[in-house]
Design a protein with these regions (language model features):
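Class I SAM-dependent methyltransferase Rossmann-like catalytic core
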Residues: 2-59
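Class I SAM-dependent methyltransferase SAM/SAH-binding core
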Residues: 66, 73-132
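A short acidic, Gly/Pro-enriched loop at the edge of an enzyme's catalytic core
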Residues: 128-143
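A short SAM/SAH-binding and catalytic strip from SAM-dependent methyltransferases
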Residues: 141-156
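A short glycine-rich, Lys/Arg-flanked "PGG" loop and its adjoining helix->strand segment in the class I
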Residues: 159-171
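Short alpha-helix
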Residues: 213-241
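A C-terminal cap/extension of S-adenosyl-L-methionine-dependent methyltransferases
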Residues: 239-294
């Protein structure tokens, strides 16, 4: 397995979308969109996955790859045309994403979800909880998960998923994990504050709050939580130092997300869509390239 040729352990940044290789990969994965104008952090995650797997020699039509919380994202169909096998796992048909990218029909008719022709013989789709992966130890050459870890529950549940991802990786295997990271967490968006609000309201508000679990900004991880609940429990090695800095221009179009789902970009234009404000805090995507020791 070869080494990484570029910076992957980083936060999503507007400058990334000026990189010719990244733009070329996005044109291949999403040919119907212009990546120069459709600047979005979710497709950045696709590019990070595709480029890192290419760097590491995994796009060899032999590698066995597991997608955790895979939904029906087009990257899994793209991978079937380039690796030996893709196992897509999710709680299909249940959970918060059942009506979106994790519909139950993915289990019975994945071809209906495919945006382009793919190697159907290389795709296996299974209902599976990320905290209890039903595969033997050391089953996969690579595992990926894109913006899913933070949705698995409280910190203890993320720990379990991280351990399971490491368990099913073969020695020397790679996990490419993307998650929502809080670049700025307001002091009021803290677990003790949410827990106090829950207590004062006699449990009628912020019902999911706990000693270590936020309620208002629950589905994003702080840098410390990435370390404590993803990297350390997995026992995997971060392949590069993590860079969470973003350029000033990336902050120009922070999109405010309201509880009812409304989105309000600072400039009035949806793109670039890289930073999201939830309540008083701001998040984006982060990429973690991890390797299991030999």
């Amino acid at each position: 397995m070869t080494d990484l040729t570029r910076r992957y352990a980083k936060a999503c940044d507007l400058a990334d979308f000026r990189d010719r290789r990244l733009l070329g990969v996005l044109r291949d994965i999403l040919p119907e969109r212009d990546p120069v104008t459709h600047v979005e952090r979710k497709v950045w995650e696709f590019a990070q996955l595709a480029m890192s797997f290419e760097d590491l020699g995994l796009l060899d039509h032999r590698s066995r790859v597991l997608g955790v919380g895979a939904g029906d994202e087009r990257i899994l169909f793209w991978l079937t045309n380039r690796v030996g096998e893709v196992a897509a796992t999710d709680i299909y048909g249940s959970g918060d994403f059942a009506s979106r990218e994790a519909g139950g029909s993915m289990l019975t008719e994945p071809s209906a979800h495919a945006p382009f022709a793919y190697r159907e013989d290389r795709l296996e789709v299974r209902w599976m909880d990320a905290r209890r992966l039903e595969f033997p130890d050391a089953s996969f050459d690579a595992v990926y998960s894109l913006s899913s870890l933070e949705h698995f529950g409280g910190p203890g549940q993320v720990d379990l998923a991280a351990r399971e991802i490491a368990r099913v990786l073969r020695p020397g295997g790679v996990a490419l994990l993307c998650a929502d990271v809080l670049l700025r967490r307001h002091p009021l968006n803290a677990a003790p504050v949410d827990l106090a609000a829950r207590a004062v309201s006699l449990g009628t508000k912020r019902r999911t709050a706990g000693l270590r679990r936020r309620s208002v900004v629950a589905e994003a991880l702080t840098p410390r939580e990435l370390l404590r609940h993803v990297i350390e429990p997995s026992g995997l090695e971060l392949m590069q130092p993590l860079d969470l800095s973003v350029s000033p221009e990336t902050w120009d179009n922070v999109c405010r997300l309201y509880p009812d789902g409304r989105q309000e970009p600072a400039t009035g234009s949806f793109f670039p869509h890289l930073l999201v404000q939830v309540d008083r805090s701001v998040l984006t995507s982060v990429c973690l390239p991890l390797r299991r020791g030999t």
